[in-house]
């Protein structure tokens, strides 16, 4: 609806603009009143007036024409509304108020009229006849420019029907106004014959212009030549324009008369020549004058005896011409206004058609909307009725549910009271039972504490018994170790006693054999000394010498036996101490193992695996350490064996002594051990210088040959290690006596000699290994 109001307001505005351009003052006032009323009525509603209101205010004849005509859209003239309104106001102020049936001038006429009055008020203008016809004064330059623009303007051509209607209505008053129309040449041919009105002019006949001065009308001379009958062509399209009409109609009569008289007096008094052809071709206003003007001109040239008669005739002609011109202009204005009204009516019809179509579309849309609203209202009513029924059912259900709930709550309250009484009785009974159970639990806790104390006492007694058992086991192991030691010592003692007995037997046999050999040697010496009588004192000397040597050797043997017993005692003590230390270490390790096993946690797969790894690592380390110890022992024993082998190679060369008397109380094993020990000690101790040549001599002598008795060194007595005895001679004497070569003394065979040497070497190695272990 807003768009319809806007469009109606736009249509009214266009109508007012067109009426201001082309209509009369009455219709303009009517449309302005309609617009003002629409503006006052639409100020509250926010829009312009409706087309119905504007149509009601129009005149009745306008409404009839509005219903029959069609609308024509304006051709780009909407922007001239303000200018046309201003021109209309100016025209209303300048022109007198016309009557009811009088036509008002158009916008272009009012504009030209206002320009004319502005020029009159600006200052005195030069007379039109005072200037040259060919000149171009500056006073009429604005009118010339307006005419120049009119040449390029649009020419309004009317339809034949409208022209015939206007001619039928106004044909009696203006029969000669269409004489020279270019649009309707048949009218011009029919109206060329009427005679001029008015009395025939008296006086001399006026002459026309000379042939060398053609009637050429320029554009700037149009304003002065408009009222001249020679230059008027009413059918020309240029004279049909509004500005030309305003110049023809609105010039004051006094000014026109003065101008016409001045022009007429200045014309030459000659007969008019036929019009030059150039007159028709120069300028838009160059056309033939009408016959009613040409007639008086011919009469003026023929008969004008005096100037006054001529002037009177001219005045009558001018008045008639002005009257005809006014009638023609009025008819033209009526024709133009009717054409403009027809165009406006067409535009109004088109706009009304468009408004009616919009109204019909709006009505259809509103009918559709109303139908849709009706259907939606019906749907909503049905939905509301359905919801009301549903709400009623729900309310009934709610009431029934509330009633049932109230009855149930009452029943539940009664049942709950009974249940509460029962629960109270049950809770009292349960409290009594709970008190009984608590007393029983207190008794059981006391019994459990007694049981726990008893268990602790039993565990303590068990731990004490286990400790006593462990200590008893340890003591038992120690006693068993002592028993084993005693048994081993007894076995060793028995073995030593057996060895001593065997050694004593061997020594007895050797002693007896040596005594026998000694006796044999003495007998040989006697037999050898008898032949030589001269040397009677030599046997005595040899006997004394031998007795001294024997005594020295016995002393040496005694000293060696003492040393041997001392070292044997030390060896036994050291061996016993070593055995005791080994047993103590074994018992400590066993006890440690038992404590570890006892205090170890319960075995688990992971802990057993870790313990297996740890025990394996410990065993591996123990084996490595044991291997290292054994390797060191082997190296030491190898070194001792090498030393003993060297000494054994040296010992046989020193066994060059006579018969020895071994001690009966010294076992043979101890002798061998003492000999080995003495030989081993002799490596570290410093030997006497006197023993060096004897040892070197024995080293050079071969083992197979019998060695003769070496000369005895000087007696250099020195104390032994323990200081018990004093011996003369080197300490190697015992080993030499124990390691005597059987071939040199007893004459044994080679096999017996090697067997005895092997047994002596084996005993030495065994004893030395034991001594090295003890010392380590």
From Swiss-Prot:
Residues 101-307 are annotated as: Required for interaction with CDH5. One of its GO terms (cellular component) is plasma membrane. InterPro entries: Angiomotin (IPR009114), Angiomotin-like (IPR051747), Angiomotin_C (IPR024646). Residues 314-509, 543-570 form a coiled coil. Residues 196-213 have a biased composition (Pro residues). The keyword Cytoplasm applies. Keywords: Cell junction, Cell projection, Coiled coil, Cytoplasm, Endosome, Isopeptide bond, Phosphoprotein, Ubl conjugation, Wnt signaling pathway. Residues 220-307 are annotated as: Required for interaction with CDH1. The record marks 107 as: Required for interaction with MAGI1 and ACTB. It holds the Pfam family Angiomotin_C. There is a cross-link at residues 347, 408 (Glycyl lysine isopeptide (Lys-Gly) (interchain with G-Cter in ubiquitin)). GO terms for biological process: actin cytoskeleton organization; angiogenesis; establishment of cell polarity involved in ameboidal cell migration; hippo signaling; negative regulation of transcription by RNA polymerase II; positive regulation of protein localization; regulation of cell migration; Wnt signaling pathway. The record marks 213 as: Required for interaction with YAP1 and ubiquitination at K-347 and K-408. The modification Phosphotyrosine is found at residue 107. The modification Phosphoserine is found at residues 756, 759. A motif (PDZ-binding) lies at residues 773-776. Transmembrane segments: none annotated. Residues 41-88, 119-142, 169-215, 283-309, 591-620, 677-743 are annotated as: Disordered. Residues 177-192, 297-306, 678-687 have a biased composition (Polar residues). It is found in: Recycling endosome; Cytoplasm; Cell projection, Podosome; Cell junction. Part of a complex composed of AMOTL2, MAGI1 and CDH5, within the complex AMOTL2 acts as a scaffold protein for the interaction of MAGI1 with CDH5. The complex is required for coupling actin fibers to cell junctions in endothelial cells. Within the complex AMOTL2 (via its N-terminus) interacts with CDH5. Interacts (via N-terminus) with MAGI1. Interacts (via N-terminus) with ACTB; the interaction facilitates binding of cell junction complexes to actin fibers in endothelial cells. Interacts with CDH1; the interaction may facilitate binding of radial actin fibers to cell junction complexes. Regulates the translocation of phosphorylated SRC to peripheral cell-matrix adhesion sites. Required for proper architecture of actin filaments. Plays a role in coupling actin fibers to cell junctions in endothelial cells and is therefore required for correct endothelial cell morphology via facilitating transcellular transmission of mechanical force resulting in endothelial cell elongation. Required for the anchoring of radial actin fibers to CDH1 junction complexes at the cell membrane which facilitates organization of radial actin fiber structure and cellular response to contractile forces. Belongs to the angiomotin family. This is Angiomotin-like protein 2. It comes from Canis lupus familiaris.
